[in-house]
Amino acid sequence: MKTMQGKGSGRRLRGALLVTMAASGAIGLAGCGGSNDNTTTTTPTNVKPSFVGTVTVTHFDGVSDDLLTAGLGAAGLASATAPTVANATAPTAAELRRLAIYNNYRALVDTNAKGGYGTLYGPNVDASGNVTSGSGMVPGVEYVAYSDDGSGQQNVVLLVQIPDAFDAANPCIITATSSGSRGIYGAISTGEWGLKRKCAVAYTDKGTRAGPHDLATDTVPLQDGTRTTRAAAGSKAQFAAPLTDTQLAAFNLATPNRLAFKHAHSQRNPEKDWGRFTLQAVQFAFWAINDKLSGGSAPNGSALAVRPDNTIVIASSVSNGGGAAIAAAEQDTTHLIDGVAVGEPGLNLPASANVQVQRGGVTLPVTGKPLFDYVSYANAFRLCAALSSSVSGAPTQSFFAGNIGWPASVQANRCAALHANGLLSSTTTAAQADEALQKMRTYGWEPESDLVHASMAYFEIDPSVATTFGNALARASVLDNLCNFSFAAVDTSFHPTTVNATALAQLASTGNGIPPTTGVQLINNLAQGGATQSKQSVDSSGTQAANLDGALCLRKLLTGADAASQALQLGISQTLRTGNLGGRPALIVQGRNDALLPVNHGARPYLGLNAQVDTSSKLSYIEVTNAQHFDGFIDLVPGYDTLFVPLVLYEQRALDAVYANLKNGTPLPPSQVVRTTPRGGTAGSAPAIAATNVPNFTNTPAVADRISVSVSGGVATVSVPN
C-alpha cells in the first residue's frame, strides 16, 4: 500500500474526484471505488477513455519475443549487428518493432560492457541491482492505440506494456514519454526500470515519431511503422502532411524529392500538449490494466483492481520526454501522478520566472532561456567555438581537421562569416574561435561542456533541433520551407535525390524523427548552385560556412515581427512551465557537462521556480559531474568513454528513490552535486567502469556538495557549488 507521505488528505481528495473524472472519461471509470473514510460507495466499471481509438493487444511470450528487448535479449541489444529484415523494402510490423526497440535502446544507453552494461545496468541486472545469468526478456502484453481529437490529424500513439509479473496487489505505473522526436519506443530505457519492478509502463510518442511523409511518392507511415499511400491510409496514417493534392503537386514540381516529418510539419505545435499526452497515456494504462486483469470483460458492479487511489504512478523519462513528465505533473488536476523522476529534462521557463543561478558564489549572467532561444544561439556560434585551441583535443574535432564528412576549413569559414556579420569582433581565426567559445559560456553553457561542443557541431545537432523546433513552434507547413530549409536524401553531389527505398521503409524504426537522420539530410534551398545539403552548401557570402544564413534566419524568429516570427513566439509561450508540482516528491537528475540542454537553462532555474510557487515542494535536484546528454555516444564517439560516466544509472537511481519514498516513506535525498570519476585511459579503449566511478547520491551530502535555494524579495537564488 502506498503511503503518499504528507498527502493523506490528498488521497481522500483523489477518491472523491474519481466520480467526476470517470463521468468525463478521464480515467476510464464510471464511478469511484470509495475514499479512505469509506463514506462513499459506488460501482466502478472499466470504460475506455473517449480519446482512445481502436486498440490492438499483443502478448509476447518472453522467449521468442518480449516487452523489453523484442526477443533479442541483453546480448542482442549489445550486438553491433542490427536485427535482420527478410524483405528490406517491405519490413513487417514485427520486424519494425524489433528494429525500433534495438535502435532506441542503443541510442539512449551505452551497451558496451566496459561502460557498465550488464554489470551496473541493463536487462540482465535485476531491480535490486543484482547481475543475473538471464537474458532480461520480459513476457507480457502490449496495448496500442491512437489518441485523436476527431480530426485524424493528431493520431498520437499510446502504448501500455503490462508484464505478466504485474503485481495487482502492489500496482504501479511508470510513464515513458518518448525522448527527442522519437517514436513510441523512444524511452524504452525508462520503461526497463518499470518492467523490472513489475510495473506497467505507459508510453506515448507525444505527437512526434520518425516515419516521414514522402512527398514525392505520397506515401505515409501507419501506426505500426509500415507504409502505404496517403489515400489508402486515410485517417489511419500516423502522419500525413496536411496538404491538398494541388498543393502537393505544385510543391513537388518546385522542390522535388522532399520529405515531411511529424514533429516539424504537423502544424500543431505538439510540444504544447506533451503533458496532456503523457496524462492520456496514464489514463489509457489504467484502462488497459483492468481490461487485462478482467480478461477483457468488466461487468457492471465489479470492483476495479487497479485505481488511482491504490496505484503508485511515477511520471518519468529523459530529455524532452522528461520535460513532458514534468508538464504532466504540473497539469495533473485529477491526481493521477504521485511522483516524478526524470533525467536531463527539457524545460522552457517563463521570462518572468525571477530566478538567478549562482555557481561558486558567482551569479551567472544568462540563465533560464527556452530551448529555441539557446539552441538557435548555439546554432550560430558552436561550430566556430569548437575550433578554439583550448578544446583542440575534444572528441570529433580531429574529424573536422581531416575533412571527414565536412568541407575543408568549414569551421574557420564560419568564424569569418560571423565576423563579417558583426557577431564576432576578433580578426584572426584563432581569436574568433576563442571569442565564440566565451560567448557560449556567457550564454549559459558551463566550462564542463567545452569538450562536448565539437561533437555537437559534428553531428549537426544544433541545426537539426533549431530547424525542427522552429517549424513546430511556428506551426509552419512543409510548403513554407521555413528559413529556406527542407529535408531530403542527397546524391554524391549533395543535391536532393530520391530517398533510398530501404531507408524509407525502415525509417520509422531507424530514425530519430529530427533530420539529419538515417539518410535524410538538412537542405539549404537557397544555396548557390541550387538546393544543397546544408552543411556542404555555399551561401550568399560565397563561402562554405555551413549555411550561416539559415542559422541567422532561425535566430531572428525570436525577435522578428513578421508572421512566422510571431507564430513562433506564440508557440514558445504555449510551452512554458509553471514550476508547480503540487507538492509531489520529485527528483531531477542531470549531467553538469550537458551541452544540448545546459543545466543553467533547465534544471537549475526550474529548482528556483519551483521553490517560489510550490509551497509544499518536495523537489530535489541531483547534478552529476562528468556526465552529458547522450549516453549512446559513450561507446560511439572515441574519447567519450574516457571522459563521461553513464547518466542512465542515476536516472534509474532517481526512480528507485521516488518509488521508495512513495511506497515506504523513505526520505528523498536533498539537492546535491554527485562527484564521479571518469574512466580515463585511451580514447576508444577506456578501462572498465567500477562502482567507485559512479557513487550514489546521499541523504547527507557534504556541505561542499549541497545545492541550495533561497527566496527573497520575489527572487529565487539557486546556489550550486563548484
Swiss-Prot record:
Q: In which pathway does it act?
A: Lipid metabolism; butanoate metabolism
**GO MF term set:** hydroxybutyrate-dimer hydrolase activity
Q: What class of enzyme is it?
A: hydrolase
What is this enzyme's EC? 3.1.1.22
Reactions catalysed, as given in the entry: (3R)-hydroxybutanoate dimer + H2O = 2 (R)-3-hydroxybutanoate + H(+)
- Output a single Gene Ontology CC term carried by this record: extracellular space
Ordered alphabetically, the record's keywords are: Hydrolase, Secreted, Signal
One GO BP annotation here? Answer: butyrate metabolic process
- What positions does UniProt annotate as the active site of this protein? 319 (charge relay system)
Q: Does the keyword Secreted apply?
A: yes
Q: How does activity depend on pH?
A: Optimum pH is 7-8.5.
For this protein, the record's Pfam families field holds: 3HBOH
Taxonomic superkingdom: Bacteria
Q: How is its activity regulated?
A: Inhibited by diisopropylfluorophosphate (DFP).
| Key word Magnesium present | no
Q: Which InterPro entries match?
A: OHBut_olig_hydro_put
Protein localization: Secreted
Secretion signal: which residues?
1-25
Q: Which family does it belong to?
A: Belongs to the D-(-)-3-hydroxybutyrate oligomer hydrolase family.
- Protein function: Participates in the degradation of poly-3-hydroxybutyrate (PHB). It works downstream of poly(3-hydroxybutyrate) depolymerase, hydrolyzing D(-)-3-hydroxybutyrate oligomers of various length (3HB-oligomers) into 3HB-monomers.
* Protein name (database record): D-(-)-3-hydroxybutyrate oligomer hydrolase
- What is the protein's species of origin? Ralstonia pickettii
